[in-house]
Swiss-Prot record:
This is Uncharacterized protein C1604.06c. Its main location: membrane. Coiled coil: none annotated. It holds the Pfam family CBF. Keywords: Membrane, Transmembrane, Transmembrane helix. Belongs to the CBF/MAK21 family. The chain crosses the membrane at residues 284-304, 328-348, 353-373. It is a multi-pass membrane protein. One of its GO terms (cellular component) is small-subunit processome. GO terms for biological process: rRNA processing. It is found in: Membrane. It comes from the Eukaryota.
Length: 485
């Protein structure tokens, strides 16, 4: 039935009213998903056919001919059809339809571009699609994945205009929210925009990318235009209210997928410093981006090391993200130009925290301190000083790492760890009592240790001697006549 209605349209313009019949099929309340999909696909093919025949171009306003009336009728119904297409992205439990309708949407965008004299990408329908996509609370993960992998990554013009459109959509919705418009759900827009932006590896064209339209748009291939659109899109997204999870998602990619492609990376300074001063887990993730701005883009942030020092608390050594933190901390303290008093405070605080840390965390702290002492020999005096000489001058509660008095204190904590209940930790800590001739530890070898890996290592360890047992083993062959049981 649907196929017959479609074929009749190709045969004669007299059958254009079949468009209305097909349109009625796109109704999930009265038809099955398969019928809705088939009817929508048929109309997509019909409108692509009509665009090639010039029926999707509006006639001049003063043209009242029969042909002009047909064109206006076709264009009006085309708008209704595209609205029906985009509505599906706001419906629940229709993941398969969302992917299918995405394909139809992009085909129509291509057909519209072919109507243009230059053959470049036309944005009229695409921007309405972007508005619906970013505003949807029912957008499926599989639809986003298909949009990113099938269109945004391989096609420069689709990606470029998405950057432009997302900025326009966000600006429009922010203005709407000022008038208490209930439709302007900024949380949803932030969630969808960042999900999509974070999934794009690079905004710049590569040898494997091309244009979705027949001819590439000049602006979509110019590096300066791309970076400007990319920057405006990201800054608009970051101006929206972000949940802790969204903060984490952004901060996980910002140093690799955002900062290198911005025209003015310093514009992220406020965002990163706010993140660094916020929730503990967010602060840890903000380290990399903030440090990148400091090293590569001359950001002046004098409170970086005091704030970094404040992150060293008892909770840190129990977090899942401690491995990432120690990778970054090793990078931040690697410069030999840092003051010895600063390095000494970090060493001493970590040593103190190790006293109450789990074995997996201690296995990171000891090699980390060893490497720091080798890199900063001035701090070796802490290792050789006896705590009985003048007591421990270290002020654990002092927030400024330059004023803790750690450089005048003793690392008695490392001596204590040499008597740890877990023999492997005690053996590892004993390296501090030996000459510092051993090369620096590869920190990566210690970052993933935990109770599970330690138990597994113990269970796999071969026994040198059979352990003695209290009771004599008995077998059925030994008989029961002498048994006391």
């Amino acid at each position: 039935m649907i196929k017959d209605l479609e074929n009749e349209i190709y045969k004669s313009r007299k059958n254009l009213n079949n468009i209305l019949v097909l349109f009625d099929y796109i109704d999930l309340s009265n038809h099955s998903i398969d019928e809705v999909n088939d009817a929508a696909a048929a109309l997509c093919r019909v409108y692509c056919y009509l665009s090639r025949n010039g029926l999707l171009k509006r006639p001049k306003e003063d043209d009242s001919s029969a042909n002009a009336q047909v064109k206006n009728w076709v264009c009006d119904n085309y708008i209704n059809y595209t609205e029906k297409l985009t509505e599906i992205f706001s419906m629940a439990n229709v993941e398969a339809l969302q992917v299918s309708f995405l394909t139809m949407t992009m085909r129509l965008c291509k057909a519209e571009s072919q109507m243009d004299e230059n053959g470049t990408f036309r944005n009229q329908f695409y921007i309405r699609f972007c508005l619906e996509l970013l505003s949807s609370s029912q957008l499926s993960d599989i639809c986003i994945k298909d949009f990113v992998t099938s269109y945004l990554v391989p096609y420069d013009d689709v990606r470029f205009f998405f950057y432009k459109n997302s900025k326009k959509v966000i600006s429009s919705l922010i203005e709407s929210s000022k008038t208490d418009d209930p439709m302007a759900n900024l949380d949803i827009v932030a969630f969808n925009t960042i999900r999509i932006l974070s999934a794009i590896p690079s905004p710049l064209p590569s040898s494997s990318t091309s244009s979705w339209a027949d001819e590439p748009s000049p602006s979509s291939t110019e590096t300066s235009s791309i970076k400007r659109a990319f920057q405006e899109s990201w800054l608009s997204a970051l101006s929206l209210p972000l949940s802790v999870n969204l903060y984490k998602q952004v901060l996980n990619v910002i140093h690799k997928r955002v900062i290198p492609f911005l025209q003015k990376p310093n514009l992220l300074m406020d965002f990163l410093t706010d993140a660094y001063n916020s929730h503990h887990a967010v602060s840890l993730l903000a380290l990399n981006g903030l440090f990148t701005l400091m090293i590569s883009h001359n950001l002046d942030y004098p409170l970086f090391y005091p704030k970094l020092y404040a992150l060293l608390d008892r909770n840190l050594l129990y977090l899942k993200t401690r491995s990432r933190f120690f990778r970054l901390l090793d990078l931040f303290l690697s410069s030999t130009h840092l003051p010895a008093t600063l390095i000494a405070s970090f060493i001493k605080r970590l040593a103190r925290l190790a006293l109450t840390a789990p074995p997996g965390a201690i296995a990171i702290v000891i090699p980390f301190i060893y490497n720091c002492l080798q890199r900063h020999p001035t701090c070796m005096q802490m290792l050789h000083r006896s705590s009985a000489e003048s007591g421990d001058s270290f002020d654990f509660d002092q927030p400024d790492p330059l004023l803790t008095g750690a450089i005048e204190s003793s690392l008695w904590e490392l001596s204590t760890l040499q008597n740890h209940y877990y023999s492997n930790i005690a053996s590892l800590a004993s390296i501090m009592s030996q000459k510092f001739t051993k090369p620096r530890y590869e920190l990566e070898d210690f970052l993933d240790h935990g109770y599970a890996t330690m138990c597994d290592a113990e269970l796999r360890r071969p026994l040198k001697n059979e352990p003695p047992i209290e009771f004599e083993k008995r077998t059925l062959a030994s008989g029961l006549e002498k048994s006391w049981i």
